[in-house]
C-alpha cells in the first residue's frame, strides 16, 4: 500500500458522515492529517454545523476530543511543560507539526505550525495553534473528550493504521504472553470493549542500582482508543491515559480522583525493544523520566520529556482475568507482591 493510501486509511471515520452534537446536526466536511516533529500522527476533522457554526474533532490514539474556539493564548516562547496557567489549564505538550494531507472542505492554514496542548482539572482540554511564526494569528480551541456514539457517528469496520515499531531481534530472555493481532474483551469505562493488540514494548529502569524490566501490550479499539496491558513479574495492570491536570503532586504523594496516592518509585525508563505498531514514533534507547504513586488497586504513573507530559492510571488485573479475556490457557504465576496489588482479606 502506498504512503498516500496509508494516510487516507489512518482513520475510522468517513468524509461526509452526518452526526449531531446536543441536538445540532453537522457534517464531517473536511479532514487534515497532521504529524508532529516527533512523529506522532493524528486527524483533525472539520465539523460544519447546519446552523453555520464550525468545530473540529481531533482523532488521536487516545480517542476523540471535540473542540470549539475560545480566546486564551499565552506566548509560545513563555510556555514550559507542566506550567500552570492563570486560565486554570496546565501545559502538557508543546512542539511543531506539519499538515501532511487534506481531504474535503478544510480552512486554509500554514503547512507547518507551532502548537501547545493544555489540560484542566475540570476535564476540559485545549489546543493552541500558534501558526508558522511569531506574527502569525493564534487560534485557541477548548473541548472535551467524546465518544463517537455521543455524536451519532459510527466507526468504520477497518481499523486505523499506526506507526511501525522500530525493528530489531527479540531479546533471547524475553517471554511474551500475548501476540500482535490477539483480541480480547476487557471492562473499561463501565462497559466491556473488544481490544486488539497492535504493538508490544519491552522497557527497563534502574532504581538504586537494580535493573527492572516489564512489557507493555498496546491495545486498540475503534471507539475506545488506546489502552495498555502492562506486565511485570507476572503482575498485570490495565492502563489508560488521564488528564494531567487531574493530578496534584506534593511531598505526601499525588492526589487524583479524590484519593491520595503514596510515592512508590522514580527513575528513567528506557525502551529496549518493540514490535508491531505504536501510536507514536519510537526508537530503541528512548528515555523518559518516570514517577509512580500507588493506592491499591491503582497506580498513577507520570512520564515526561522536555516537550511532553503524560499521566496514566493502571488498575491491578489478576492474570486469570487477562487469560480469559484473550483465550489463553495459562499465564505465569505472579512473583512476590505488586505495589498496587490488593490485600486478600483473612478468612475467619
Model-derived segments and their meaning:
Residues 1-348:
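Mixed-charge, low-complexity intrinsically disordered regions
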Amino acid at each position: 500500500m502506498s504512503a498516500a493510501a496509508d494516510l487516507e486509511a489512518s482513520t475510522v471515520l468517513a468524509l461526509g458522515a452526518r452526526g449531531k452534537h446536543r441536538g445540532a446536526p453537522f457534517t464531517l466536511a473536511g479532514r487534515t492529517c497532521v504529524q508532529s516533529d516527533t512523529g506522532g500522527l493524528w486527524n483533525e476533522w472539520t465539523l460544519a454545523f447546519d446552523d453555520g457554526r464550525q468545530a473540529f474533532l481531533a482523532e488521536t490514539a487516545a480517542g476523540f476530543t471535540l473542540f470549539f474556539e475560545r480566546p486564551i493564548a499565552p506566548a509560545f516562547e513563555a510556555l514550559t511543560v507542566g506550567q500552570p496557567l492563570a486560565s486554570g489549564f496546565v501545559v502538557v505538550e508543546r512542539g511543531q507539526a506539519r499538515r501532511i494531507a487534506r481531504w474535503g472542505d478544510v480552512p486554509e492554514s500554514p503547512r507547518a505550525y507551532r502548537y501547545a496542548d493544555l489540560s484542566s482539572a475540570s476535564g476540559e482540554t485545549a489546543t493552541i495553534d500558534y501558526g508558522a511564526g511569531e506574527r502569525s494569528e493564534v487560534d485557541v480551541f477548548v473541548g472535551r473528550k467524546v465518544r463517537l456514539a455521543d455524536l451519532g457517528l459510527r466507526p468504520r469496520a477497518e481499523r486505523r493504521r499506526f506507526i511501525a515499531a522500530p525493528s530489531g531481534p527479540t531479546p533471547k530472555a524475553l517471554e511474551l504472553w500475548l501476540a500482535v493481532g490477539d483480541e480480547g474483551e476487557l471492562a473499561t469505562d463501565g462497559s466491556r470493549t473488544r481490544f486488539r493488540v497492535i504493538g508490544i514494548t519491552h522497557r527497563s529502569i534502574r532504581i538504586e542500582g537494580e535493573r527492572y524490566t516489564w512489557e507493555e501490550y498496546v491495545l486498540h479499539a475503534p471507539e475506545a482508543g488506546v489502552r495498555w496491558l502492562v506486565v511485570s513479574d507476572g503482575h498485570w495492570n490495565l492502563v489508560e491515559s488521564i488528564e494531567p491536570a487531574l493530578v496534584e503532586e506534593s511531598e505526601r504523594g499525588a492526589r487524583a480522583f479524590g484519593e491520595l496516592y503514596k510515592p512508590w518509585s522514580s527513575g528513567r525508563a528506557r525502551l529496549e525493544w518493540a514490535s508491531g505498531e505504536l501510536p507514536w514514533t519510537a526508537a530503541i534507547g528512548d528515555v523518559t523520566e518516570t514517577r509512580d504513586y500507588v493506592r491499591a488497586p491503582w497506580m498513577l504513573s507520570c512520564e515526561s520529556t522536555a516537550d511532553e507530559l503524560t499521566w496514566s492510571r493502571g488498575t491491578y488485573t489478576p492474570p486469570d482475568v487477562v487469560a480469559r479475556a484473550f483465550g489463553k490457557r495459562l499465564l505465569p504465576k505472579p512473583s512476590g507482591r505488586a505495589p498496587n496489588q490488593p490485600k486478600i482479606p483473612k478468612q475467619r
